[in-house]
């Protein structure tokens, strides 16, 4: 079997020597950085899998103090090139500067001394002001208190909430017939309805002097005198002067069809 020749490693950065690859291999022996100091990042031992030019190019150089490399073995530190600089991560400041631990005499003690919620006296504890908030200036007169008052608007009942957007819909007007008490939403419909009680017919035909309650009824009536029949049946071709007369005629055709189908089934 012939021996397989491995391809030569591709240089990552022009300023780095090929000997720095041994540095990446030696980094695997370093202890893993705790996950709480590098959240959402890979461990320090996985740097050999990342192209180094993606970390060094395009970012400002950052010099770390010697204490940062206190855990690096001597064999690894001898392989480090002086020209190699770690990049700065402006979007991860907590990686370089870890969170300060809460000391026993600092704010941690204040958190421990905070009184617990008294469930025995529930009504009193709910209405009583928190002394810790008053000490930090979160009272009703403070800016934080004003913000809390604004946020309390969301807790109001639906009746007390201020209306936003559209104005409340107006109540529909109702027009009541004085003869029978029937309700209408439009005044014109009420006017036509009251003419059935009074038998008022203000629209009169000029030819035959027939009177009508509605103007559209007079318009349909005039087709009789002009012998125009604009409304024609699509089945038999018969013409009509009024649309409502054509509608009645169509019902006759539908009744005839029903009779034929019933005879066929029998």
UniProtKB/Swiss-Prot annotation:
One of its GO terms (molecular function) is sequence-specific double-stranded DNA binding. The modification Asymmetric dimethylarginine is found at residue 116. Transmembrane segments: none annotated. GO terms for cellular component: nucleoplasm; nucleus. It is found in: Nucleus. Induction: Transcriptionally regulated by Ikzf1 and Runx2. A zinc finger (C2H2-type) spans 175-197, 203-225, 231-253. Pfam families: zf-C2H2. Disruption phenotype: Mice die prenatally with severe heart defects including defective atrioventricular junction and venous valves. They never initiate metanephric kidney formation. Nephrogenic mesenchyme undergo massive apoptosis, which causes a disruption of nephric duct elongation and failure of metanephric induction. GO terms for biological process: cell differentiation; cell proliferation involved in kidney development; cellular response to retinoic acid; chondrocyte differentiation; embryonic digit morphogenesis; embryonic forelimb morphogenesis; embryonic hindlimb morphogenesis; embryonic skeletal joint development. Keywords: Metal-binding, Methylation, Nucleus, Repeat, Transcription, Transcription regulation, Zinc, Zinc-finger. Gene3D superfamilies: Classic Zinc Finger. It comes from the Eukaryota. Transcription factor that plays a role in the regulation of embryonic heart and urogenital development. Belongs to the Odd C2H2-type zinc-finger protein family. This is Protein odd-skipped-related 1. It comes from Mus musculus (Mouse). The lineage of its organism: Eukaryota, Metazoa, Chordata, Craniata, Vertebrata.
